[in-house]
């Protein structure tokens, strides 16, 4: 390959374009730019973890590929744990690779509300198609395992719509290590698909390189200032000059970087997530979820506002989930083969914020749920409990500290149309969006309809930050679709700019 994952000690670099972040957004931008013949430098804060060296142990895998080792949370009542990838390939290395498009009605709603140009479902369809082709979005052949059957049987018994989920995969072996980096390269993450392709075209990727700031001069992003950690653990200062700059560091670190660079207008003020409540279902017969793929069906009857699905299950991950209330839940560890882990997620009305802190790498993240979000969480938890009992569960234990669990279907009505207890409820999310909403509604949007940061001619955002609101589905396909679209628009914008400059000369 012409590019590479290796570190480099050069201090002064120049390129046609620099991309900050190597996840779904950054890799998609790189694919467009390198195909157009541009010389691209990509900067990634995390390291490269090849499939061949991916650890099967949760503690090692989290430390290698997850930001903060998986221990990150948004401040609020309650704090909400969230997950981000921090490695070459970003979140695509640790997610479930589920491939879904955002609802067409929702896309139209965003187009009108934020005044986003050329944003109809038909106009976005080509980009979604490109994303799906890239990752080979497909149904998983063969038996899917009892965890999947449980969710399907429960939903169908209640007369709900249940959908089998497409995933980005080729010849999945069912290792059940999606969250730990796929050990055989079957999951079609960015490190398997687009990044090698872009590097073959000459892209240079610097791993373990944290970007500190972007220097803005005369309305342009002039220099990207970063620090690379070399093989000996020493820091090396790096400065990159490029005609085009793309920030693709995710919905948390993109706004943090922009604000550190002096760009604050409507940036980092509108964080959206998918608040998620989990429940453990205990059955009389072994589920052996650790031997199966994560559940590959979802209850889609109530989408896009609410969705019910299943989680990756290993003994270690299950133990971590019980640790939130070990006094009352620890005994379930002895029955772990009889257990399955499921969740309900919602599209919230509440919003959060992202603020960088002086001298600290991690920004301050906060999120406040709206009152109606608590009602919605109570509803989706009720639905989840109903589905588990309909599938034959003996007991369902919601992720609420001190809760004794339900032992029959009648008990799950406890929170029907009622708010969950704020202090005791344990929430999490793996989906983060909307900190740089796009559009021509200048009072609401941080970037224009094509991802360009207002007031900076050559600076673009192309990651989950530009999904206008929570989409109610796994976001990878939407991130990739928008990144393809933004990269194409940036090339067109750059061509027009060069032509205008030549005309002036």
UniProtKB/Swiss-Prot annotation:
Cofactor(s) this protein cannot do without: FAD
Read off the lineage from the record: Bacteria, Pseudomonadati, Pseudomonadota, Alphaproteobacteria, Hyphomicrobiales
Q: Where do the catalytic residues lie?
A: 431
User: What name is this protein filed under?
Assistant: Uncharacterized GMC-type oxidoreductase y4nJ
Organism equals: Sinorhizobium fredii (strain NBRC 101917 / NGR234)
Stretch forming the signal peptide: none
GO function term, MF aspect, one: oxidoreductase activity, acting on CH-OH group of donors
Gene3D superfamilies, alphabetized = FAD/NAD(P)-binding domain
What PROSITE patterns is this protein classified in?
GMC_OXRED_1
User: Which Enzyme Commission number(s) are listed?
Assistant: 1.1.-.-
Family as reported in the entry's similarity comment:
Belongs to the GMC oxidoreductase family.
Superkingdom of origin organism: Bacteria
Q: Which InterPro entries match?
A: FAD/NAD-bd_sf (IPR036188), GMC_OxRdtase (IPR012132), GMC_OxRdtase_N (IPR000172), GMC_OxRtase_C (IPR007867)
Q: Which UniProt keywords apply?
A: FAD, Flavoprotein, Oxidoreductase, Plasmid
């Amino acid at each position: 390959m012409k590019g590479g994952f290796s570190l480099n000690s050069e201090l002064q670099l120049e390129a046609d374009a620099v991309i900050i972040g190597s996840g779904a957004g950054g890799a998609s931008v790189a694919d467009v730019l390198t195909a157009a013949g541009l010389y691209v430098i990509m900067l990634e804060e995390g390291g490269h973890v090849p499939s061949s060296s991916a650890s099967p142990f949760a503690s090692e895998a989290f430390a290698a590929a997850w930001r903060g080792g998986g221990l990150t949370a948004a401040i609020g009542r309650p704090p909400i744990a969230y997950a981000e990838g921090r490695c070459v390939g970003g979140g695509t290395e640790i997610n479930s690779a589920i491939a879904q498009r955002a609802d067409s009605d929702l896309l139209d709603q965003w187009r009108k509300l934020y005044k986003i140009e050329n944003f109809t479902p038909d106009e976005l369809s080509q980009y979604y198609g490109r994303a799906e082709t890239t990752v080979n979005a497909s149904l998983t052949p063969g038996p899917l395992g009892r965890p999947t059957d449980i969710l399907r049987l429960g939903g169908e018994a209640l007369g709900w719509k249940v959908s089998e989920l497409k995933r980005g995969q080729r010849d999945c072996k069912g290792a059940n290590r999606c969250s730990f980096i796929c050990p055989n390269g079957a999951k079609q993450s960015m490190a398997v698909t687009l990044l090698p392709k872009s590097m073959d075209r000459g892209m240079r990727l610097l791993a373990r390189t944290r970007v500190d700031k972007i220097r803005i001069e005369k309305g342009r992003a002039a220099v990207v200032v970063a620090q690379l950690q070399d093989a000996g653990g020493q820091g090396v200062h790096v400065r990159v000059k490029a005609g085009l700059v793309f920030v693709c560091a995710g919905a948390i670190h993109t706004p943090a970087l922009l604000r550190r660079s002096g760009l604050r207008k409507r940036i980092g003020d509108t964080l959206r997530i998918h608040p998620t409540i989990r429940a453990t279902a205990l059955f009389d017969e072994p589920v052996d979820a650790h031997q199966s793929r994560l559940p590959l069906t979802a209850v889609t009857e109530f989408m896009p506002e609410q969705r019910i699905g299943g989680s990756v299950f290993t003994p270690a991950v299950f133990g971590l989930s019980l640790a939130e209330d070990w006094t009352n839940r620890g005994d379930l560890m002895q029955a772990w083969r009889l257990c399955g882990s499921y969740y309900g997620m919602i599209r919230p009305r509440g919003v959060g914020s992202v603020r960088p802190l002086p001298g600290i790498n991690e920004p301050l993240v906060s999120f406040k749920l709206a009152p109606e979000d608590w009602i919605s969480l109570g509803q989706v938890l009720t639905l989840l409990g109903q589905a588990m009992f309909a599938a034959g569960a003996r007991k369902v234990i919601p992720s609420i500290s001190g809760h004794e669990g339900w032992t029959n279907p009648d008990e799950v009505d406890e929170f029907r149309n009622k708010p969950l207890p704020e202090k005791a409820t344990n929430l999490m999310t793996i989906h983060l969006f909307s900190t740089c909403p796009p559009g021509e509604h200048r009072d609401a949007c941080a970037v224009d309809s094509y991802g360009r940061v207002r007031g900076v001619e050559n600076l673009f955002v192309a990651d989950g930050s530009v999904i206008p609101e929570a989409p109610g589905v796994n976001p990878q396909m939407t991130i990739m679709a928008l990144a393809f679209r933004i990269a194409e628009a940036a090339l067109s914008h750059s061509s027009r700019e060069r032509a205008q400059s030549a005309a002036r000369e």
